[in-house]
Design a protein with these regions (language model features):
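Gly/Pro-rich loop segments of beta-rich domains
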Residues: 1, 27-54, 78-93
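Conserved beta-propeller blade signature
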Residues: 11-12, 61-62
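Structural signal for beta-propeller blades
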Residues: 19-22, 69-71
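Primary detector of tandem Cys2His2 zinc-finger arrays in metazoan DNA-binding transcription factors
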Residues: 12-14, 21-24, 28
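Cysteine-rich, disulfide-stabilized extracellular repeat modules
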Residues: 7-9, 17, 30, 43-49, ...
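A short, acidic, flexible beta-alpha connecting loop/helix-capping segment that sits on the rim
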Residues: 59, 66-70, 77-79
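Short loop/turn segments immediately following the C-termini of beta-strands
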Residues: 16, 26, 66, 76
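Residue-level detector of Asp-centered blade-edge/turn motifs that repeat once per structural unit
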Residues: 5-8, 55-58
Length: 93
């Protein structure tokens, strides 16, 4: 549903059906899972039908985790294939 391309040409995609966030580096033929990918869930670094994503000015990634009624914030290593690190949780009703 949601796609973001950063200044370096890296593509970030919400994969709602598989409950994960994917990343493709510029000119890469394959992507990697940076958040989720462990099945549906409500634990940190798990998602339940993510819907949107956005970076802030500091490079933190915010993911709207629809079925868990929350927004998760992750610190992302943009220079390697390291997965995102869970930082904060915002709950909403």
């Amino acid at each position: 549903r949601s796609v973001v391309i950063d200044q370096m040409g890296t593509v970030y995609v919400v994969d709602s059906i598989n409950h994960r966030i994917m990343r493709w580096f510029k000119d890469s033929k394959s992507g990697n899972v940076i958040i989720g990918g462990r099945g549906i869930g409500s634990e940190p670094n798990q998602l339940s039908y993510p819907e949107d994503l956005q970076f802030d000015r500091q490079g933190n990634l915010y993911v709207v985790d629809l079925n868990n009624n929350r927004i998760q914030m992750f610190t992302i290593d943009k220079s390697s294939c390291v997965k995102g690190t869970f930082e904060k949780l915002l709950l909403f009703e």
